[in-house]
Amino acid sequence: MYGVCGCCGALRPRYKRLVDNIFPEDPEDGLVKTNMEKLTFYALSAPEKLDRIGAYLSERLIRDVGRHRYGYVCIAMEALDQLLMACHCQSINLFVESFLKMVAKLLESEKPNLQILGTNSFVKFANIEEDTPSYHRSYDFFVSRFSEMCHSSHDDLEIKTKIRMSGIKGLQGVVRKTVNDELQANIWDPQHMDKIVPSLLFNLQHVEEAESRSPSPLQAPEKEKESPAELAERCLRELLGRAAFGNIKNAIKPVLIHLDNHSLWEPKVFAIRCFKIIMYSIQPQHSHLVIQQLLGHLDANSRSAATVRAGIVEVLSEAAVIAATGSVGPTVLEMFNTLLRQLRLSIDYALTGSYDGAVSLGTKIIKEHEERMFQEAVIKTVGSFASTLPTYQRSEVILFIMSKVPRPSLHQAVDTGRTGENRNRLTQIMLLKSLLQVSTGFQCNNMMSALPSNFLDRLLSTALMEDAEIRLFVLEILISFIDRHGNRHKFSTISTLSDISVLKLKVDKCSRQDTVFMKKHSQQLYRHIYLSCKEETNVQKHYEALYGLLALISIELANEEVVVDLIRLVLAVQDVAQVNEENLPVYNRCALYALGAAYLNLISQLTTVPAFCQHIHEVIETRKKEAPYMLPEDVFVERPRLSQNLDGVVIELLFRQSKISEVLGGSGYNSDRLCLPYIPQLTDEDRLSKRRSIGETISLQVEVESRNSPEKEERVPAEEITYETLKKAIVDSVAVEEQERERRRQVVEKFQKAPFEEIAAHCGARASLLQSKLNQIFEITIRPPPSPSGTITAAYGQPQNHSIPVYEMKFPDLCVY
């Protein structure tokens, strides 16, 4: 019946007649607008017919596509677009199913124009806000197809660009349609993100190719507008901007995989650009999630090539700086812990030459210079991220890094690799470099907070090591902490300026907190400066650092007492060069003379005591004439001019402690303290600094002297402590502990299980025993004094002392006066 009615136009359903009337005889004439208005009015008047209209239009479109009647295909899609824009009723869901079916048909076509047409219609549909969204609608096909279009490799460059842009627009439409509706398909699922994100990155990756084309000035705006790279970046920003807390991981993981698969970490330019887009697009409070993803990826690639790891670290550096302005959350120490762990692994790789700890057949050989580059990248990242942290977090990071530095010891095991270097030494150097990066620019008004005791102790104990490079790092770290006004660069060159006002120093009055700090730690600092000056392996950089440290202490932390102590310290350094008990080379002795001259010249002008300045100036002028090798201008140059004989230096060339004490004492300084020579006190860490070879053995001998007989002192032979005696002592102590533990267990068990009467009887017996012992003690201690007249015999035949009162005693005449 329906088939017969279909043959006669008058008997066909009205919606079919209205649909047929919108198609002209010649497709070139386009859509019949008057008939389209009638169809739209009918659809609005009878919404229940909308799904049938869509089904019929879909049927016609599929037929026209099969017959290659592309003009009618375009008309059908235009009609569908207008119906979608006009209708917002509940029945539109069924109509949308037909619409999506037609769009899918166009996207399946091999004709680029039809693919672009279908994409444009889908984008229009995506921009429509539906009143009642459908949760059963699936967009899997569209995600796959649009992603495929993003990777188009058409021979024609212009057509390829159009197809790629259509694919990007389609993905953007899918995101807009689904991302904010929880009832619809979850676009954040990994199976969707693994297609969408790489497709966008693929087009971003070819931005250089697009920019390499140089269009004419008139065509430039059009080309710029049609760039797939810019459209992909805009789509990626929109996608990430809509990401919620739980979706960040699914959005970031495909980025990491894409960079791995296409080896994009090594040039690192594109990777940095990608993560800058990510960090600026996501919500600030989610930034720490991206950092966590990067840290995890760095750990996962711990055995990858050094260039790959360096690229990840560079990206991490850029991302962390951006994240620090938002919310880094609990990842601060986690980030530094990961970076320091990677630093240790890199040191092991460089020493062993492989990722497995030993070189074997088939093992990937590591390039040492690449590992060095990676280590420098890690250190740079540590510094750049730390510079963005607030003061309190930066202090925590400083303490955290210092806790990772291996402690120096007398017997530091040497673990050598191909280069024969000490693993602990390299670790110390790299961690101190990291600490220097973190401390650079660190400003804290309270030095007690900036340099707490536990941190300062560990840092200064490291300063006593034999390695010259480590000592230099420690000095630079101290300078970074103490310099709070940016004066350190003004002391980078050691000189004896006649007027220090040209340096334009920023000087503030010493605060109460600084005074407390110096009272507590000044002697510790002076001792390490003194011992550092005596090191034979010092070079020019060490003396420059020592001069800078002395100068900064004088400017930042000095009061009158500190100034006096610093002058005493420098005069003691002059004595080291003069007496030369350490057998220092000529250069070191000349350097110490020059260091003392430069510092005393500075401190004399800071104190502004005319007589003090005059004495220092006179000695410097005398040295210029008779001994220029004792001044920094001749010593701290590329080719030092030294004296071959420094013995017998005349007193006119030396700064005299008595003279300085006299002139400063007249200006209110403590002259008594100035007269005292500086002598450093040896501490445990100083004894620790006595470097000994690994093969050196220490024999511990314990001598016990018997002091029981004052007339004859008998020396007990020395007991040699061997491995067996130590083992026996440990075993015996363990046995004693076991016995004590068993006794306690029995006591507890007795009080828990024994009846009350038994416990009471036991306690009573102990009380009576205690009383008897006390009585015995009292009888011994409270005994009458002996009688001067002798003893008497008791009734039992035993001699008994008889007590005579003092007033009845008779004393010899010589004892009475």
Curated annotation (Swiss-Prot):
Pfam families for the chain: EFR3_ARM
Gene3D superfamilies, A to Z: Leucine-rich Repeat Variant
Output the PTM entry: Palmitoylated at its N-terminus, anchoring the protein to the plasma membrane.
Keywords of the record: Cell membrane, Cytoplasm, Lipoprotein, Membrane, Palmitate, Phosphoprotein
A Gene Ontology BP annotation from the UniProt entry: phosphatidylinositol phosphate biosynthetic process
Query: Which top-level group of life is the source organism from?
Result: Eukaryota
Pull one GO CC term from this UniProt entry. Answer: actin cytoskeleton
**Phosphoserine modifications at:** S212, S214, S216
Subcellular localization is given as:
Cell membrane; Cytoplasm, Cytosol
Q: Principal place where this protein is found?
A: membrane
Question: Is Metal-binding given among the entry's keywords?
Answer: no
Report membrane topology. Lipid-anchor
InterPro entries on file? ARM-like, ARM-type_fold, EFR3-like_ARM, EFR3_Homologs
PANTHER family given in the database record: PROTEIN EFR3 HOMOLOG B, PROTEIN EFR3 HOMOLOG CMP44E
Q: Which family does it belong to?
A: Belongs to the EFR3 family.
Record function comment: Component of a complex required to localize phosphatidylinositol 4-kinase (PI4K) to the plasma membrane. The complex acts as a regulator of phosphatidylinositol 4-phosphate (PtdIns(4)P) synthesis. In the complex, EFR3B probably acts as the membrane-anchoring component. Also involved in responsiveness to G-protein-coupled receptors; it is however unclear whether this role is direct or indirect.
Subunit (UniProt): Component of a phosphatidylinositol 4-kinase (PI4K) complex, composed of PI4KA, EFR3 (EFR3A or EFR3B), TTC7 (TTC7A or TTC7B) and HYCC (HYCC1 or HYCC2).
Protein name, as recorded: Protein EFR3 homolog B
Look up and give the organism this protein is from: Homo sapiens
